[in-house]
A protein has these predicted regions:
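A short alpha-helical cap/connector motif
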Residues: 1-132, 139-156
Length: 157
C-alpha cells in the first residue's frame, strides 16, 4: 500500500481505475527488484491518467524529461498518434538497457526516441514543436516550459 496516499482515496482510485497492462506490471516489478530508488517510478494510477490524457490529446510530438525506466513514456505511447514520436530524455545512462528492453517489447519502440544527457543541451538539437510535454524530472523545467512551449499541454508531476 502506498504510504503517501490516504487509504480512502487509494481505495476509490483502485475501484475506479483501469487495470495496469501486463507489460507495465513486468516493468514495475523489474524496476522495484533491480533499480536503485524504485520510488521514483510513476505509480500505476499516474500511468493510467497519463494514458487517458494521451488518448484524448492524440499527440504527434511528445517531450518527456525524466525517462527513469520508461514506465511513463510507455503510458503516454498508448495514446500517441500513429505517426507520432516521443522524445524522452534522461541523464542516467545506466538505465538505457532497461528502457530499451521494454520499449522494444511494447511495440512502440520505433516511436520512442531515447536521449541520454542533459536536457538543456538536448532539447535545442531536437528542434520540434511539442504538443505534449511531460516534466517528470525537475520542477525547474516549469520555467523552460512556460517560455518555450506555447500551445503545449503540460502534465507536471
Amino acid at each position: 500500500m502506498n504510504e503517501f496516499i490516504n487509504k480512502d482515496i487509494l481505495n476509490y482510485v483502485e475501484l475506479n481505475s483501469q487495470q495496469e497492462p501486463t507489460l507495465l506490471k513486468e516493468l514495475n516489478k523489474e524496476t522495484n527488484l533491480k533499480i536503485l530508488n524504485p520510488r521514483m517510478l510513476c505509480s500505476s494510477y499516474q500511468g493510467r491518467v497519463l494514458s487517458i490524457i494521451s488518448k484524448i490529446i492524440r499527440p504527434k510530438n511528445v517531450l518527456e524529461i525524466g525517462t527513469y525506466t520508461g514506465y511513463s513514456a510507455l503510458c503516454i505511447a498508448e495514446g500517441l498518434d500513429k505517426n507520432g514520436i516521443i522524445h524522452t530524455i534522461d541523464i542516467n545512462e545506466e538505465l538505457k538497457e532497461i528502457q530499451n528492453k521494454y520499449f522494444k517489447k511494447s511495440g512502440f519502440g520505433n516511436q520512442i526516441q531515447q536521449h541520454i544527457g542533459n536536457a538543456i543541451e538536448i532539447i535545442p538539437k531536437i528542434n520540434e514543436c511539442f504538443d505534449f510535454v511531460y516534466l517528470d524530472a525537475c520542477i525547474c523545467w516549469i520555467t523552460w516550459g512556460i517560455t518555450w512551449s506555447y500551445g503545449c499541454k503540460f502534465i507536471i508531476k
